[in-house]
Amino acid sequence: APKVIVVGAGPAGLFCAQRLLEHGVRPVVLERGKRVEERAEDVKRFSETGVLDPSTNIQFGEGGAGAFSDGKLNTQTNSPLNRDVLETFVRFGAPQEVGYLGKPHVGSDNLKKVVANMREYILSQGGEFRFSTALTDLKIQDGKLRSFTAGGQEEGCDALVLAVGHSARDTFE
């Protein structure tokens, strides 16, 4: 099977990893921040002390920037994939009504549980997560990706999906 790297453990990265598993690919998910449970502690510390950890905070870490939002799910597209996304949220612990309400609301407490459940499922199917591991370089040769560097280590890969959030602009620099 090909070695596929997914960069980012927000919604796009988690759904990508799950879809890869459905096609027999065991993804390696790189995330610059921490697991959602650890992020909650960091966010609480920030709100109490004002001390910001630049790599794991309300913007960075498993679950993405929305992990600490109110959990409202809005879309302005009328895609048939919307139902699949909502059913996936329910399968991993969101309230049943998320699957049929016009304006679904997972809730911030439920959202953290859903994210953790998605991670555990991906791990149980042979996926891998590397937290506190930022992508720092890509090696492209003859127009083809040859390797990536993350956590100070260079590794080969067959494909890499950038599923970084809006705050990870430095990844593109």
Region spans (language model):
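Residues forming the flavin
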Residues: 1-173
